[in-house]
From Swiss-Prot:
The protein's name in its UniProt record: Envelope glycoprotein E
Topology Intravirion: residue spans: 426-550
Keywords: Disulfide bond, Glycoprotein, Host cell junction, Host cell membrane, Host endosome, Host Golgi apparatus, Host membrane, Membrane, Signal, Transmembrane, Transmembrane helix, Viral envelope protein, Virion
Chain's gene name: gE
Side of membrane Virion surface, spans: 24-408
Organism name: Equine herpesvirus 1 (strain Ab4p)
Sequence ranges of Acidic residues compositional bias: 471-484
C-alpha cells in the first residue's frame, strides 16, 4: 500500500513542473490533477506599514494557443512588466484580465489582520489570500483554467507582482498490449449493487474546565468508514469567545453548520449567546486534503495535506492532524471550539467543546432548529462578524462597552442635576409662601374716652371714639414717605371740684360722678382723612343733655 502511494506521488509530481524563469513561474499540470501553487508574496510589511492590499487576477489563454506561449522579457499589459509572458504572433489575445480575489489588511503590532475580502471561484480554481501566504488551490485541473495568474501586492502605494503561467495538458495514453484469450462461455451471475456509503463518527467531550497555564489535548476521537476510491476533505477548527458573555445558556445551532450562509445564521437573535454560522467565528486551523485514497482511520495523517489558518501560539496540531494540543493555556483562551469535517465539499461530521476556567463555565446546548432572525441585522451581505483571537485584547468590544457606559453615566448625571434644580426651586417657593403675610394697617393710637365712665344703665352719655382713620383709609406700601399724624389734643385745664346742686349726698344707685361739659365744646381732633359721607348732627342732643344735668 505504501509503495502504491509513493508511486502515485511520484507520478503526480512528475506531471507538475515549476520553472522559475526571470521571476515567472511556469506550472504544467495534467488534466484532472490537483495542485497547490504558491504565489510568492513579494513584499514584506515593515514597522511603518499601515495598509496592505492583495489581489489575484487571471488572463485566459485563447483556445489553440497553448503551444505558442513563451516566457520573454516583454510587457503584454500594464500590470505585467519586467518579467512577463508573451503570446505568439499566430494567436490573438481576445480576452481581458479580470480579478478573481481581493483582500485588504491592516497592520497591527507588526502583523497583518484581514479587514475585508471577496472571492470569485468556479469550482476548480480557489484563490487564497492569507496574512502570511497567497496560494492557488487547483481541484481537478481542466484546459479551461490555463492562462496567466498574477498576484498583486500593494503596501502603502508600492506595487509588486508575481506571475504564474499555468498550462494543462492531457495525460498520455499508454498502449495496452493485445492478448488473445479464449472467452469462456457466459455465466449468469446475479448482480449485487455495490454500496458506496461513507460515514464519520466523532466522540468528544462537550466541556472541559482548565486552570491558567495548564497543558492538555483536545481530542474528538474521529472514526472514518470510507468506501470511495478517492476523495477530498477538509478539517476545520473554529473558535468563539464566551468569556464576556453573560448568558445563562449558550446554544449551538446544528442547522447553521450545514447552511452557514443563511440569513438567520448570519444575523441571529441574541448573537452573543449562540454559535450559528462558522462565518461569524474565527478559523484557527484549516487543513486541506486533495485526491486522497486511504480508507483507514489514519487517513488524516497518511494523505498529503496543506495546513492553512492563523493558529495561536499556545495551540499546536496533534500527531494525528485532527486533534489540538494546548500548551501553557492562558485564561483568555476561554471559548467554544467547534470541529467541522468536510467530505467532498459537504459537512459530514462536527462537534464542539467548551474550554473555560472555573469562573467562566456555562451551560451549552445543541439546538437542531433554525435560529430566529434578529430585529436589527445588517443588510450588507459583505459584512462579516469575526470573533477576535483569544490571545488578542478585544479593543473593539472594550471601546463599545466604554462608550455605552459613559453615555449611561451622562444620562444619570443629567437626570440627577435636573431633579436637584427642581427640588431647590420648589423649596424656595415653599419658603417664600410660608414667610409671606398680608399687609396689616396698624393704628398707632389707643382707645380714649371722651367722657367720664358711669355705672348707671340709664346713663348713655359714655361715648367711645377711636382716633384712627376710617375703614376706607388705605396705605400705599410702595410709598417711601412716612404718614404724618396730627399731635394729640392738649389736656383741658383742671376744673375745681364739683358740688351737688342740692347739697345732699349722692343719690343711691349712681356712681357719684357728674359729667361737666364746657360751654364751648372741645374741638375734636381733625381726622386724617375726611369721610366721604357726612354723619348726623348731635349738637341739639348735647345741648338738651346739658340743660337736664344742670
Amino acid at each position: 500500500m505504501e509503495l502504491l502511494a509513493a508511486s502515485r506521488a511520484c507520478i503526480f509530481f512528475g506531471l507538475v513542473t515549476v520553472l522559475d524563469a526571470w521571476g515567472v513561474q511556469q506550472v504544467e499540470l495534467s488534466e484532472g490533477a490537483w495542485a497547490m501553487i504558491d504565489g510568492r508574496d513579494v513584499l514584506t510589511p515593515t514597522n511603518t506599514t499601515t495598509r496592505v492590499t492583495k489581489a489575484w487576477t487571471f488572463l485566459e489563454t485563447p483556445p489553440g494557443c497553448a503551444g505558442d506561449i513563451s516566457v520573454k522579457k516583454v510587457c503584454v499589459s500594464h500590470s505585467l512588466c519586467e518579467d512577463n509572458i508573451i503570446i505568439g504572433k499566430h494567436c490573438n489575445l481576445l480576452t481581458g484580465e479580470h480579478g478573481i480575489a481581493l483582500a485588504e489588511f491592516n497592520v497591527v503590532n507588526g502583523s497583518l489582520r484581514r479587514t475585508d475580502d471577496v472571492y470569485f471561484v468556479n469550482g476548480t480554481v480557489f484563490p487564497i489570500l492569507a496574512e502570511t501566504r497567497s496560494v492557488l488551490q487547483i481541484h481537478r485541473a481542466t484546459p479551461s483554467i490555463a492562462g496567466v495568474y498574477t498576484l498583486h501586492v500593494s503596501i502603502d502605494g508600492m506595487m509588486k507582482h508575481s506571475v504564474v503561467l499555468l498550462t494543462v495538458k492531457k495525460p498520455p495514453k499508454q498502449p495496452q498490449p493485445r492478448l488473445r484469450v479464449k472467452t469462456p462461455p457466459p455465466v449468469t451471475v446475479p448482480q449485487v449493487p455495490v454500496k458506496t456509503h461513507t460515514d464519520f463518527v466523532v466522540h468528544g467531550y462537550h466541556s472541559r474546565v482548565y486552570a491558567d497555564g495548564e497543558s492538555f489535548e483536545l481530542s474528538v476521537n474521529l472514526e472514518s468508514h470510507i468506501v470511495e476510491p478517492s476523495f477530498s476533505a477538509e478539517i476545520q477548527w473554529y473558535y468563539m469567545n464566551t468569556s464576556s458573555s453573560s448568558c445563562d445558556l449558550f446554544r449551538v445551532f446544528e442547522t447553521c453548520i450545514f447552511h452557514p450562509t443563511a440569513m438567520a445564521c448570519l444575523h441571529p437573535e441574541q448573537h452573543t449567546c449562540s454559535f450559528t454560522s462558522p462565518i461569524r467565528a474565527t478559523k484557527i486551523l484549516h487543513r486541506v486534503y486533495g485526491n486522497c485514497s486511504d480508507h483507514g482511520n489514519s487517513w488524516p495523517s497518511r494523505c498529503h495535506s496543506t495546513l492553512l489558518g492563523n493558529r495561536l501560539y499556545f495551540i499546536q496540531p496533534a500527531q494525528n492532524r485532527v486533534d489540538l494540543l494546548f500548551k501553557d493555556t492562558p485564561a483568555s483562551a476561554t471559548g467554544l471550539y467547534v470541529f467541522v469535517l468536510l467530505y467532498n465539499g459537504h459537512p459530514e461530521a462536527w462537534t464542539y467543546t467548551l474550554l473555560s476556567t472555573a469562573n467562566h463555565f456555562m451551560n451549552v446546548l445543541t439546538d437542531v432548529t433554525r435560529p430566529r432572525l434578529g430585529e436589527h441585522f445588517y443588510t450588507d451581505l459583505g459584512h462579516k462578524i469575526i470573533t477576535p483571537h483569544p490571545s488578542v485584547a478585544t479593543t473593539e468590544e472594550l471601546g463599545a462597552w466604554t462608550r455605552h457606559y459613559l453615555a449611561f453615566l451622562l444620562v444619570i448625571i443629567c437626570t440627577c442635576a435636573a431633579l436637584l434644580v427642581a427640588l431647590v426651586v420648589w423649596g424656595c417657593i415653599l419658603y417664600i409662601r410660608s414667610n409671606r403675610k398680608p399687609y396689616e394697617v396698624l393704628n398707632p393710637f389707643e382707645t380714649v374716652y371722651t367722657s367720664v365712665p358711669s355705672n348707671d344703665p340709664s346713663d348713655e352719655v359714655l361715648v367711645f371714639e377711636r382716633l384712627a382713620s376710617d375703614s376706607d383709609d388705605s396705605f400705599d406700601s410702595d410709598s417711601d414717605e412716612e404718614l404724618e399724624y396730627p399731635p394729640p389734643p392738649k389736656p383741658a385745664p383742671q376744673l375745681p371740684p364739683y358740688q351737688f346742686v342740692d347739697g345732699g349726698d349722692a343719690p343711691s344707685g349712681r356712681s357719684g360722678f357728674k359729667v361737666w361739659f364746657r360751654d364751648t365744646p372741645e374741638a375734636s381732633p381733625v381726622p386724617l382723612h375726611k369721610p366721604t359721607l357726612q354723619g348726623p348732627d348731635y349738637s341739639r342732643v348735647a345741648s338738651k343733655l346739658k340743660s337736664i344735668l344742670k
